[in-house]
A protein has these predicted regions:
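Charged alpha-helix within mobile-element recombinases
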Residues: 160-185
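Mg2+-dependent endonuclease catalytic cores in nucleic-acid-processing enzymes, primarily RNase H-like
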Residues: 45-47, 52-168
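ATPase catalytic-site recognition across NTP-hydrolyzing enzymes
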Residues: 1-34
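Acidic two-metal-ion nuclease catalytic site recognized across multiple nuclease folds
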Residues: 1-2, 12-15, 183-199
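An active-site-proximal beta-strand-loop segment
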Residues: 31-44
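Structured core elements
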Residues: 29-30, 48, 98, 177
Length: 199
């Protein structure tokens, strides 16, 4: 069946033509974790996102396959790096950490939640993957989602998002889950100050 997302819908930032925003209004983290580390299993993915003038920017991502203790230490290091940026005003505050509340994510929420500098929000997905993808589509189509230019991991991200199919015949969708969670949090549920003033 047909692909849901079109790679051409994404906007890009980080070059002379498309400069980096002057600051982030706030930042947040999404995480989608896999239970098993076998070749055919999904990856665990953690993303850092920024919001500026009602648009969503992917800032950084770590993707891999880790057993529970290693997953916790990897995620803790990623979250600490994001949290430490708070010291610079233009980098905005880390406002939220969203972790899928399923399988290994539940364990991560419990163990990381105890040490987290920011409240951890467990994501309990009420809708199926396709519905969440369809909900996210109009926001990407409208040019509200920006990806960083010139970073190695973005190629794999765009490739996976482009390969996502309506009939679930695609191989992996862990990065798609992070994308739809981020859009749901920042663009669907969160009406920014910008939207209230200018729309």
């Amino acid at each position: 069946s047909g692909h849901v997302f079109n790679a051409d819908w994404f906007k890009w930032y980080g070059s002379e033509e498309n400069p980096h925003p002057p600051y982030w209004e706030f930042r947040f983290i999404t995480a989608d974790t896999a239970t098993k580390t076998g070749t055919r299993n999904d990856f665990s993915v953690m993303c850092e996102w920024g919001v500026y003038l009602g648009n969503l920017y992917l800032i950084n991502m770590v993707r891999g396959k880790w057993e529970a203790p290693e997953l916790l230490s990897t995620f803790s290091a990623f979250a600490a790096e994001c949290w430490n940026k708070n010291q610079k005003q233009e980098l905005g505050n880390l406002r939220a950490i969203l972790i899928e509340d399923a399988s290994s994510g539940t364990g991560l929420i419990q163990s990381f939640g105890r040490e987290s500098p920011v409240p951890v929000t467990p994501i309990k997905r009420q809708k199926d993957k396709l519905t969440r993808a369809m909900d996210a589509c109009p926001h990407i189509k409208a040019g509200k989602v920006y990806l960083p230019e010139g970073v190695q991991w973005i190629v794999e991200f765009v490739s996976e998002v482009s390969m996502f199919t309506a009939d679930d015949s695609h191989r992996h969708d862990d990065q798609v889950d992070n994308l739809t969670d981020a859009i749901d949090y920042a663009l669907i549920k969160n009406t920014s100050l910008f939207d209230m003033i200018y729309r």
